[in-house]
């Protein structure tokens, strides 16, 4: 599924080059948006594959996948309703917000934390999908119990590693994780601005 989706995105990625022949095109913003859409799509596919591995019914898998992606899309509004200032619960729920990292790319900023987040979601969901499929291959026996324990511990380690990686990347300074690729460098401080700020004596 990802291969088919990637082929579609690759074809779509040609459009900025075609439009460039007819005028000025912000190439950085265009391709960052395409990258964000590809990562978001791959994460959504990973969600659907994981849910499909939990049930043998295609209808149930489709309904649950749609519900999960819809809730994820609405998670930003849900967290604002719970607490506008933010608390521990909203921080935990924000981990399930697939759309917020996508929105970070829309202004032409290459957000490394968002890329790591999407790759983590894709990797952990694919891992859980494989674990779910492998679990069905074992019949109820003593060997199954030992395998289940191994899988549970392996899953816990994978989840913990995913959380640690995202926390480490999130703790990095924004100047190293956010790259301004906008056409007019909207999010960068120019040399003229730096010179003007050096002459300021009062707080702005």
Residue ranges and their predicted role:
Residues 30-35, 62-63, 115-119, 152-156:
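Hydrophobic alpha-helical transmembrane segments
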Residues 1, 60-64, 130-151:
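Cytoplasmic juxtamembrane regions at transmembrane-helix boundaries
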Residues 164-167, 171-204:
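Juxtamembrane extramembrane loops of integral membrane proteins
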Residues 46-48, 128-129, 161:
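Hydrophobic/aromatic residues in alpha-helical transmembrane segments
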Residues 2-59:
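Secretory targeting signals
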């Amino acid at each position: 599924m990802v291969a088919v989706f990637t082929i579609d995105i690759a074809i779509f990625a040609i459009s900025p080059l075609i439009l460039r022949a007819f005028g000025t095109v912000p190439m950085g913003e265009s391709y960052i948006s395409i990258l964000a859409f590809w990562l978001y799509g791959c994460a959504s596919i990973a969600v659907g594959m994981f849910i499909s591995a939990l049930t043998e019914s295609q209808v149930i898998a489709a309904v649950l996948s749609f519900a999960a992606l819809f809730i994820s899309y609405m998670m930003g509004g849900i967290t604002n309703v719970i607490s506008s200032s933010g608390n521990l619960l909203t921080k935990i729920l924000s981990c399930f917000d697939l759309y917020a990292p996508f929105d970070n790319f829309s202004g032409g900023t290459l957000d490394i934390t968002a890329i790591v987040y999407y790759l983590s979601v894709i990797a952990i969901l694919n891992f859980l999908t494989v674990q779910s499929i492998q679990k069905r291959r074992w019949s109820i026996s003593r060997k199954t119990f030992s395998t289940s324990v191994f899988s549970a511990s392996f899953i816990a380690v994978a989840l913990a590693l995913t959380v640690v990686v995202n926390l480490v990347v999130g703790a990095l300074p924004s100047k190293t994780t956010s790259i301004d690729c906008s056409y007019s460098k909207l999010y960068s401080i120019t040399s003229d601005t730096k010179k003007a700020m050096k002459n300021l004596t009062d707080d702005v």
